[in-house]
UniProtKB/Swiss-Prot annotation:
GO biological process: heme biosynthetic process
Pathway membership, UniProt: Porphyrin-containing compound metabolism; protoheme biosynthesis; protoheme from protoporphyrin-IX: step 1/1
A Pfam family: Ferrochelatase
Keyword Electron transport part of the UniProt annotation: no
SUPFAM superfamilies for this protein: Chelatase (SSF53800)
Family: Belongs to the ferrochelatase family.
UniProt-recorded name of the protein: Ferrochelatase
Keywords from the named record: Cytoplasm, Heme biosynthesis, Iron, Lyase, Metal-binding, Porphyrin biosynthesis
Cellular component aspect of the GO annotation: cytoplasm
GO terms for MF: ferrochelatase activity; metal ion binding
Compartments it resides in: Cytoplasm
Amino acid sequence: MRFDLEPPSSVAAAHRIGVLLINLGTPDAPTPRAVRRYLAEFLSDPRVVEIPQAVWQVLLRTLILPLRGRASAKKYAAVWMPEGSPLRVYTERQTDSVRHLLTSNGYHVMVDYAMRYGSPNISHALTQFKRAGVERVLLMPMYPQYSASTTATAFDAAFDALARMRNQPEVRTVRHYADHPAYIHALAEQVRQYWAQHGRPDFAAGDKLVLSFHGVPKRTLDLGDPYHDQCQQTGALLMAALGLSTTECHVTFQSRFGKAEWLQPYTAPTLREFGEAGVRRADVFCPGFTADCLETIEEIGMEVRDEFLAGGGKTFHRIPCLNGASAWIGALSEIVAENLQGWPVKAAQPEPVN
């Protein structure tokens, strides 16, 4: 293995601490070419698609990318913001807000973000940390619930980058925070504030709140992935915080890909069934997505909405993700601070003068 070129080590180095927020990723532009490039990287990850690569790559390159590239580009174009991809825009804002909050509380740490797929990538971010004198790194995935296809592959990418370093930093990882009180509080506040502005569903009349999490193949549950259980745990805690029952609030799973069975119940068919059963209003919230993206804005806000209305529903509300909500920035900073304990994150105070 060839190691990265590095400057000579020095005892006078900065000895800084870095916090790296890691999200999934996004195409660089809403164009077929950019989307195909992004999907090629994403769908080539064996943590994401557990099919022998010799078979999968043929299907991916000859069938899936040519078909999905153009169709997905149209969807991205429908949600693209003036500043860029929603996921990148909101993740950048979250990073800036966490950095500001930690700094205002006396923390001397670098805070940056990276994407598992696309740019800025994890390897680049860790290299930038190293050049800035960072010797301790906290890897903070923006996935509250652990899954091998999200959290684990983010750690894989980080440790692959570290494997090329001769002088490695000390590293800590945040595995999940699905049941963290501050995270649950932020979720509940996001829902309450939305209802304060748009009206609360009439649950006595049969209205529904749906908590939609990203789906994964069911076989991953059978193979020991804790994701399903952690989604259910988050859902139960949020229901309790909102004072809702399981007849008023439902946990579902979205974004199914392929023909294999995924975690159920599926979001879109559930909303269709609600409409057909006479449910007049349905609100959908995505607790597992910490920032709005294609899957929340387009899939939930457009496709799932259309399913509900086509089934006979009358009013559909997509509650925005946590994004830059103050309760969430506070929660995220709290989780980061807890995982920095024991590291010299605050500047040494001068000795008092007698």
